[in-house]
């Protein structure tokens, strides 16, 4: 039997890199995409060292025609596309809505929301054909806002809303969907230098606000730190293997505790999913 073809976005670092390598080791044919050519070369070396094969391809998810072209090419070359992990989108602009420029908001939304949406739209015809799996990584901040994460939370809320609305519809055509909601994960995006590049701020005269990175680093330190990125790959593989995966999945107890007050008794999204299915059923 031919191996299942899995497309993973954002594989040049962090969770995407771990997911791609772990999936290849588990027997998937993995198409690993990213937009940093130097790091893609490093990923190829790491795959070779681990004795796994990756089909590594350049992809800038904000280039929507390129997204459609690449996903179409993947389906043609491999003959099918069985699963997509759309997880590129760790773009931050720390600060309040007052501080972050309008261009800063657009910059964050363009990658975190519109880029992932382009991947989903391009992949769905192929996933319907294979009755495949769609996993979309958002964040615990896609359900619960957090101070100084205004733009990031907005982008993740938007993605959560789109995928939550989509999931019960595409399920009727054989596509099973899961929204993955990590808390802080030990990736490069959590490094201070990464944030400093993305502090797209308007000047606030006599600003009462603390320095955003200092605030965030203290919060992370007081909540038990970050999740090891190596924990995420096996969790994604488990979700891909489930016959009836949940609509929602939090990768760590911290994330579950963080979103629980808002989700109450529906942590895995089953109740909202069933309500949506009933709503669809009203149309006959």
Language model segments and positions:
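Conserved glycine-rich cofactor-binding loop
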Residues: 12-14
């Amino acid at each position: 039997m031919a191996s299942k073809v899995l497309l993973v976005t954002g594989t040049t670092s962090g969770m995407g890199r771990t997911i791609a390598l772990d999936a290849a080791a588990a027997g998937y044919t993995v198409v690993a995409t990213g937009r940093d050519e130097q790091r893609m070369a490093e990923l190829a070396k790491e795959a070779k060292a681990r004795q796994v094969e990756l089909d590594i391809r350049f992809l800038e998810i904000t280039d929507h025609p390129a997204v459609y072209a690449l996903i179409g090419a993947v389906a043609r070359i491999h003959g099918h596309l069985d699963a997509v992990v759309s997880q590129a989108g760790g773009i931050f602009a720390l600060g309040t809505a007052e501080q972050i420029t309008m261009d800063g908001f657009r910059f964050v939304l363009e990658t975190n929301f519109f880029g992932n949406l382009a991947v989903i739209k391009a992949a769905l015809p192929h996933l319907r054909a294979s009755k495949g799996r769609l996993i979309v990584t958002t964040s615990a901040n896609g359900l619960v806002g957090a101070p100084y994460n205004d733009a990031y939370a907005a982008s993740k809320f938007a993605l959560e809303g789109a995928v939550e609305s989509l999931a019960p519809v595409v399920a009727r055509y054989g596509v099973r969907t899961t929204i993955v909601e990590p808390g802080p994960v030990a990736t490069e995006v959590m490094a201070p230098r990464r944030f400093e590049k993305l502090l797209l701020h308007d000047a606030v005269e006599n600003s009462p606000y603390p320095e955003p990175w200092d605030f965030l680093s203290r919060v992370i330190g007081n909540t038990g730190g970050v999740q090891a990125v190596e924990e995420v790959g096996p969790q994604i593989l488990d979700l891909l293997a489930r016959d009836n995966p949940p609509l929602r999945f939090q990768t760590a107890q911290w994330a579950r505790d963080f979103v629980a007050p808002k989700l109450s008794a529906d942590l895995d999204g089953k109740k909202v999913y069933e309500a949506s299915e009933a709503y669809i059923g009203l149309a006959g």
